[in-house]
């Protein structure tokens, strides 16, 4: 078994991140600019000796420049899942915990970190294995079902890549049910049918709008009808996970998810004494009441001034800003989840449609596309491999939830439900001999108090993923310690810097890590660890210490 950092599938790669790093185009452009200045290869921080060990001669990796259109990422991926090989025999063996692994206990450095955080060792579970060998080196509370937080995304993304294939694309289709006059007026309704594209952002939706115009339609005499039948109605506009209903991480899934149903307000003071407010994405019927002025107050008070007060008056929504905003505080962006999915998509679509004088005379409604309607435009979203990259690098909940439901819809039959998706994923795991008897799926993102899995089960999935045809797309999607994603600011001065692909997980009272470590000894390791405790937030050092210990040789 080759080490996980030596890709088993030879293809070109790109490490340029996308729109997902933030919820606005402006933030994404800043991230793209930063990455453009970074080393071309994500392992550039490794010593030359490590690179020669890991990438020669088997993994002759060729890098090519990635063209960035706006903030989208161009990636090449492994063969589709329908061409997958027989799973590695080790992936089919149910994990067996030896007495030595059970008795090994936690490393002393990890115990010290737990003690400092006031977290008992009983609140932590750990499994460490060599890649290709499911016999654990450490198995601490290995079989205990735990809250995994966002490490549950590993189950959803590996299943998605394997079942749908890395080249899978979502489709968003426009239909018309009437004739188009010579002057460009559609005598009927315009229908938009979604299939759950997790990354339908402004620069993607404008492609659909342009194609509708190219079909000869300038005006719509009827209404705008949104077909959301791909997901069951029970999956949409759900209660938020916690009390912060405006937090983007709380946005639920939707077949016509647009811009993550979140709006970005950026406040920027200028040398002329004025304070500008910019909004992304543009929404119809949204007005800005800007009463900000450039003063000499504190930047702490400026944070409050940068957060708008939202007021609805019929169809109009007004975002009001007021107060002192000093020049020295610089630009500040506030991301808010607002409106319901239908209203958000409709207003986003109308804003783009109206830019070149387009009109829709009738109301916005939900409904199925009639059988007599004809397709007039289709937008294909980014490939699944790119979406999985964003889901795992930046731990995007709503993208994971849309992928989770898509798995059920494609492998089963629409409308998708969480139960249907869970059955499809369980059947996939069973077919491929991946033993996860304690797995409990809810929404596939980890943003749940109902999802559970043991460290031993998740380690079995990581072993199988590394031995699969989608190994490279999967491993490439995981944050690299000290380099990018949710691990960018961790272990930046440690030996493990650049030598671990780790998915993180965070909830109140939960901290989790899961992924792969390339050890200094030339061995590659699988690691999974969960901490479920009231003081879990203070125990991040225990996980960082564990990763350093593994990198040093796991002994």
Predicted region positions:
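Small-residue-rich helix-loop
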Residues: 137-139, 404-555
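Hydrophobic helical h-region of N-terminal Sec-dependent signal peptides
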Residues: 64-79
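A short glycine/serine-rich beta->alpha loop
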Residues: 140-146, 335-336, 445-448
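Short active-site loop at a secondary-structure junction
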Residues: 139-159, 164
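Conserved serine DD-peptidase/penicillin-binding transpeptidase domain
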Residues: 84-117, 163-436, 545, 552-555
């Amino acid at each position: 078994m080759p080490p996980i950092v030596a890709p088993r599938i030879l293809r070109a790669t790109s490490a340029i991140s996308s729109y997902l790093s933030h919820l606005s185009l402006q933030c994404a452009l800043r991230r793209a600019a930063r990455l453009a200045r970074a080393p071309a290869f994500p392992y550039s921080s490794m010593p030359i000796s490590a690179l020669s060990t890991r990438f020669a001669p088997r993994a002759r990796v060729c890098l090519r420049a990635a063209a960035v259109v706006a903030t989208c990422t161009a990636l090449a991926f492994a063969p589709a899942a329908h061409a997958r090989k027989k799973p590695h025999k080790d992936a089919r063996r149910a994990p067996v915990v030896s007495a030595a692994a059970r008795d090994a206990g936690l490393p002393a450095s990890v115990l010290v970190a737990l003690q400092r955080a006031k977290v008992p060792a009983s609140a932590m579970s750990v499994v460490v294995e060599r890649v290709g060998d499911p016999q654990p080196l450490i198995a601490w509370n290995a079989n205990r079902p735990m809250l995994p937080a966002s490490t549950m995304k590993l189950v959803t993304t590996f299943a998605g890549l394997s079942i749908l294939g890395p080249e899978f694309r979502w489709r968003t289709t426009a239909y018309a049910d009437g004739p188009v006059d010579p002057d460009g007026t559609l005598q009927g309704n315009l229908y938009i049918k979604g299939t759950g594209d997790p990354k339908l952002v402004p620069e993607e939706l404008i492609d659909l709008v342009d194609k509708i115009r190219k079909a000869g339609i300038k005006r719509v005499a009827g209404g705008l009808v949104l077909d959301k039948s791909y997901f069951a109605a029970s999956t949409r506009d759900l209660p938020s996970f916690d009390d912060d209903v405006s937090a983007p991480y709380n946005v639920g899934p939707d077949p016509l998810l647009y811009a993550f149903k979140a709006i970005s307000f950026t406040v920027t003071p200028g040398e002329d004494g004025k304070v500008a407010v910019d909004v992304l994405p543009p929404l119809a019927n949204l007005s800005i009441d800007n009463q900000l002025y450039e003063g000499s107050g504190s930047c702490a008070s400026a944070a409050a001034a940068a957060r708008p007060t939202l007021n609805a008056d019929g169809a109009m929504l007004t975002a009001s800003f007021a107060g002192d905003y000093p020049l020295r505080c610089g630009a500040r962006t506030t991301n808010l989840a607002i409106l319901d999915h239908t209203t958000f998509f409709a207003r986003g679509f109308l804003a783009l449609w109206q830019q070149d004088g387009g009109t829709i005379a009738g109301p916005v409604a939900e409904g199925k596309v009639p059988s007599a309607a004809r397709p007039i435009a289709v937008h294909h979203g980014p490939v699944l491999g790119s979406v999985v990259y964003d889901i795992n690098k930046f731990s995007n909940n709503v993208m994971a939830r849309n992928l989770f439901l898509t798995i059920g819809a494609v492998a089963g039959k629409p409308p998708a439900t969480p139960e249907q998706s869970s059955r499809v994923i369980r059947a996939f795991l069973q077919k491929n001999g991946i033993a996860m008897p304690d797995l409990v799926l809810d929404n596939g993102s980890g943003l749940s108090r109902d999802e559970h899995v043991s460290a031993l089960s998740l380690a079995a999935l990581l072993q199988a993923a590394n031995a699969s045809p989608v190994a490279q797309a999967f491993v490439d999607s995981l944050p690299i310690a000290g380099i990018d994603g949710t691990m960018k600011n961790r272990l930046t001065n440690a030996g493990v810097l650049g030598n671990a692909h780790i998915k993180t997980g965070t909830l109140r009272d939960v901290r989790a890590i899961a992924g792969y470590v390339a050890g200094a000894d030339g061995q590659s390791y699988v690691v999974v660890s969960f901490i479920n405790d009231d003081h879990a937030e203070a125990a991040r050092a225990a996980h960082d210490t564990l990763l350093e210990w593994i990198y040093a040789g796991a002994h």
